[in-house]
Amino acid sequence: MKINLDPMPDRTTEEIQSLVEKQIEKIDTSITAGLRTFLIQPRLETRDWGWSEPIRAFPVWIIAESKRYDYCLLYSDYGFGPANPWGLGFSSYKGFDADYCWYGSLEDAYKDSRLIEEYDEQKK
């Protein structure tokens, strides 16, 4: 998997919201109903890229969060982005996580997340 640690232009909250909405437009509405319950106003954090010496920190956007668990969906142009900019992560963990936690689309990240199970639990 290709990685990007080169400087990228800074993004705004509005740009990230727009990226999220463009991804949602591509997803079947039966899936987006659940996804939308977890979306938040994108929040910028800095997370450590632990596979370099010295360890470097890069911007990561939290775009969705669990209401019950330490779990979130992420977006970043760094690390495994831009090819796989949508990630699964723990809200309390400040690293990028492994390559298998990053996806080419928001849909794939959401489908592989525990958020789907949490949404199903909420409906019961």
Describe every region a protein language model picked out.
Residues K2-I3, R43, G87:
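A broadly tuned "polar low-complexity/structure-edge" signature
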Residues K26-D28, T32-G34, P82-K124:
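Polybasic, proline/glycine-rich intrinsically disordered low-complexity segments
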Residues T37-P82:
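Amphipathic, interaction-prone secondary-structure segments
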Residues M1-I24:
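N-terminal trafficking/processing presequences and adjacent post-cleavage segments
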Residues P7, R11-E14, R36, G50, ...:
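Short, well-ordered helical secondary-structure segments
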Residues Q17-D48:
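Short, well-structured hydrophobic secondary-structure segments
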